[in-house]
Every structure is written in C-alpha cells, then in structure tokens.
Amino acid sequence: MPINYEYIVVLGGSELAYTSSITNKLSLNSSSERLIASVKLANEKKNRKIIFLGGTSSLLEQKNIIDETDVAKKFFRDVNFDLKRVIFVKETKNTIENLKKLKKLNLRIEGNSILITSAFHMKRALLISEKLDLILIPYAVDFRSFEDSGRDGLINYYQMFSIVKNLKSLNLYFRELLGIIAVKISM
C-alpha cells in the first residue's frame, strides 16, 4: 500500500443504526473494523482525511431513526477523532450510490485514496469504482473465517459445525454474488 495517500474512503455497513437509535448508544456490528482501521490509518499522518459514505439501506422511510452516518459520527467522537478531518456523505442506499456521490465531490482522489470495506465486499466495491472511473487502492478488513480453525481432525470439525453460521455465510456469499452480477448487467 502506498504511504502517500490523502483520503481514506470508508464504506458504511458496520453501524447498527436502529439499535443505536433505540438505545441512544453507539452500536456496531461485526464489520466495525472498517471504522477502526480508518482512524488507525488517518492517525498515521495528520493531513489525511476520512470520507465516510453511508446512509440507510432500508427501502422504507423510518422516522426518528438515525442513519449510518450519524452512528459513524458518534464513533469518531467517542474515539476523540477530529470531526473536521471527516467528510460525511449521507443519504445513500448502496455501494453504487456511495461511489457516485464520492465522484461528485470532485476531490483529487484518483490514485490518492484507499478504499476500506470488508474483504467479502471488496470485489464488488472495486468493480463499481472501476465502472465509475474511480481509482481507489483497496484496503480490506473484516476477514471472515472459521473460528478455531487451528483445530484439526474430523471430530473437532464436526463439533464446530453450525448450520446457522453456515447459512449466514452462504447468505453473505450469494448477496455479494448477486450484487456483482447486477453491477455487470446494469452499469
């Protein structure tokens, strides 16, 4: 990864906006590494800015519910990160809208920015950015793997087998696969 990049582009998706709204507390999901990595990388050089792309993926309007951007803002505040170094892009529903709005910012991001998202989502995000002529350097986080993968032997594998976890993984895989197909067809 190049050392001299100016912008850290973070895709939303690690925030539990509904839970955060109800509890009035910061609530993140298993993709929270996206936010954590952005702060870590931004703190390496004081001139780096974070561009947070988020909104709500809900197709229905939800009153009195904060969105991903509001939760991310709370996260940055809670870790004492200077909000003047964060550009928040709101009101998007998916990665295509996120990256289209990023392009409209007219910042000098070409080859000067890294893209942080979950490893499982990176292929689709880069495909979209390529279709939009955005050159972003990938920085994958949130790698998903078998827990306790250090164990070996059939008995131990059988003990780790979980239908629910496997169905969640399969759901994630098919969602990304359908997303990639949709991008290739529609863009």
Q: PLM features: residue spans?
A:
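A structural signal for short, hydrophobic/glycine-enriched beta-strand patches
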Residues: 1-159, 163, 167
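A transmembrane-helix-recognition feature enriched in membrane-embedded lipid enzymes
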Residues: 166-187
